[in-house]
């Protein structure tokens, strides 16, 4: 009697099925990771402007611009945000956008970042907002799915 070597077809099919399940799970987790990293990136990019806005408000320069008694928070361009520069003297690179804010700035200024088509498809058109309160504190809210938001940012369906 000959001794059998190797695996049976059934055993190989089971291994291939297990690898397929693991690969599909890993792909879904990676896609969620990409979305979460983009949301966190925009949270930080928009959040950087809070200090500049506070400086403008403290100096009493609330109109956006480069002139005397004007303020430029210096919003830098991002390839996953939509929105034109609000300072007419500043030109941003093509296919980039900047965080939007009211002109003039107010005590309850909202820094609004809208995700463009370069962001993950599940967050196209979603907004992330840093909202200033009269007390000077800031809070973050967004209409992106809650599972993608960092712990410091709350889901808000009304946006």
Curated annotation (Swiss-Prot):
Q: Which residues carry this modification: N-methylphenylalanine?
A: 7
Topology relative to the membrane: Single-pass membrane protein
Its cellular-component GO annotations read: membrane; pilus
- GO BP terms in the entry: cell adhesion
Source taxon at top rank = Bacteria
Q: What is its main location?
A: other
Protein localization: Fimbrium; Membrane
Q: Which residues cross the membrane?
A: 7-27
Which PROSITE patterns does UniProt cross-reference here?
PROKAR_NTER_METHYL
Q: Does the UniProt entry include the keyword Amino-acid biosynthesis?
A: no
User: Which Pfam families did the record assign?
Assistant: N_methyl, Pilin
Name the residues of the propeptide: 1-6
Going by the UniProt record, its keywords in alphabetical order are: Disulfide bond, Fimbrium, Membrane, Methylation, Transmembrane, Transmembrane helix
Q: Cystine bridges: which residues? A: 56-71, 140-153
* Protein family (similarity comment): Belongs to the N-Me-Phe pilin family.
The record's note on quaternary structure and interaction partners says: The pili are polar flexible filaments of about 5.4 nanometers diameter and 2.5 micrometers average length; they consist of only a single polypeptide chain arranged in a helical configuration of five subunits per turn in the assembled pilus.
| Cross-referenced PANTHER family | GENERAL SECRETION PATHWAY PROTEIN G (PTHR30093), PREPILIN PEPTIDASE-DEPENDENT PROTEIN D (PTHR30093:SF34)
Name of the protein in its database record: Probable minor fimbrial protein
